[in-house]
């Protein structure tokens, strides 16, 4: 998908935008220009979410700081969004970007996510940008054999590392989870082992849940 569409450069004001903020020229010119371009629709619509709990009280309920940024359903709209927000490596420690199929919230409590789990890749600080982009392209481009099992992806910036994760619907479907994990590693050319954690196991464990699957 990415090879068929030319990326657009970020706007000149990108460095001055706050995290999660989308550039807007205010005169409607971007929307007008988009209307003159033949759009390439995606199989699914996707919503970008941003979570920046920095400065919030630790008593605030988990998930209460997550808010949607933009929903896109074409290749052009994706690049228009991606080129006008910060890369993960530029986010504050503790912040997360989420990209989930439209109408699925990036929360364990969402009924579509409730019985699922996640594959996770960890990397050093400042190293997640490429992993995140390639994950998004594979996901919204429907490159996974079990793409219907995928809810979305998350990139998390933490003090000592950054993490990219793919959330799936049905943790009990071992064949689907193994396929997704293996294909994801291939798309990213990632050589180390990765583990799949079931959401229910994560909620019950205080010391860190064990991997249900490993590839």
UniProtKB/Swiss-Prot annotation:
* Name of this chain's protein: Eukaryotic translation initiation factor 4E-1
Q: List the disulfide bonds.
A: 113-151
Per UniProt, what is the name of the gene that codes for the protein in this document? eIF4E
Q: Which GO terms describe its cellular component?
A: cytoplasm; eukaryotic translation initiation factor 4F complex; nucleus
**What family is it from?**
Belongs to the eukaryotic initiation factor 4E family.
PROSITE patterns linked: IF4E (PS00813)
**Where in the cell is the protein located?**
Nucleus; Cytoplasm
Q: How does it assemble?
A: EIF4F is a multi-subunit complex, the composition of which varies with external and internal environmental conditions. It is composed of at least EIF4A, EIF4E and EIF4G. EIF4E is also known to interact with other partners. In higher plants two isoforms of EIF4F have been identified, named isoform EIF4F and isoform EIF(iso)4F. Isoform EIF4F has subunits p220 and p26, whereas isoform EIF(iso)4F has subunits p82 and p28.
> Which GO-annotated molecular functions does the record name?
RNA 7-methylguanosine cap binding; RNA binding; translation initiation factor activity
Q: Which UniProt keywords apply?
A: Cytoplasm, Disulfide bond, Initiation factor, Nucleus, Protein biosynthesis, RNA-binding, Translation regulation
Residue ranges, annotated region (Disordered): 1-32
Chain intervals for the UniProt region annotation (EIF4G-binding): 40-43, 50-86, 134-143
Q: Which PANTHER family match?
A: EUKARYOTIC TRANSLATION INITIATION FACTOR 4E RELATED, EUKARYOTIC TRANSLATION INITIATION FACTOR 4E1-RELATED
* InterPro entries, alphabetized: TIF_eIF4e-like (IPR023398), TIF_eIF_4E (IPR001040), TIF_eIF_4E_CS (IPR019770)
Where does this protein have compositionally biased stretches of type Acidic residues? 16-27
GO biological process, alphabetically ordered? defense response to virus; regulation of translation; translational initiation
Q: Does the keyword Nucleus apply?
A: yes
**What does the UniProt PTM comment say about this protein?**
According to the redox status, the Cys-113-Cys-151 disulfide bridge may have a role in regulating protein function by affecting its ability to bind capped mRNA.
Pfam families xrefs: IF4E (PF01652)
- Binding positions for mRNA? 58-63, 90, 108-109, 158-163, 203-207
- Carries keyword Translocase? no
Q: Quote the function comment for this protein.
A: Component of the protein complex eIF4F, which is involved in the recognition of the mRNA cap, ATP-dependent unwinding of 5'-terminal secondary structure and recruitment of mRNA to the ribosome. Recognizes and binds the 7-methylguanosine-containing mRNA cap during an early step in the initiation of protein synthesis and facilitates ribosome binding by inducing the unwinding of the mRNAs secondary structures.
Highest taxon in the source lineage: Eukaryota
